Amino acid sequence: MSYQLSERWTFDMFYSNRNMSGNVDNRFITSLKKDGYYRTSNDFNKRNTFNNQLIGSNLSYNGKYIECGLTGVYNVFNKMLNPSIRYYNTYYARGRDFLNIGINYKLFWKDFIFSGETAVDKRGKIATFNKLSYSPDSDKKFVVMNRFYDVAYQSLYARSVSEGNSVQNESGIYIGMETNLLGN
């Protein structure tokens, strides 16, 4: 549901209640099935074994030189998410409920654009991604991107630039240039 509060302000709300698939051992969810394939009887035994409710909202401002927003998302399962502890999954999400609050921003100044997003989970762990781009003309663009995702940051649905498959335990800088060598 979306509300246009004024010419520049928008408020969005969303809610989801769905059954999900994964391994369930008594009252614990031991793994989430994310591939969507149900080819074997073992796959079918994992289908719709627990419930997830998600509620959230976003307040955003869209101005001439600045765009920004504040987002909050709350997830709750009907069972405890508790994967078996292994060396490789020490910091995987664990618990019954998850809260994430984030801000996004984009500033325009002459040929520069600074943008990014910073989020915090319910335990105070941070994930942030920031980008500065400079376009001196229509054929060239210089970009610097920085990311820092705390080793223990937990968000079930976060997606961002990363070398791994989760927004967790990474930091890095990317420097690049985009150009049109052949012209228009």
Which role fits each region the language model picked out?
Residues 48-85, 90-184:
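Exposed, low-structure sequence patches enriched in small/polar residues
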Residues 1-58, 150-175:
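Surface-exposed coil loops of outer-membrane beta-barrel proteins
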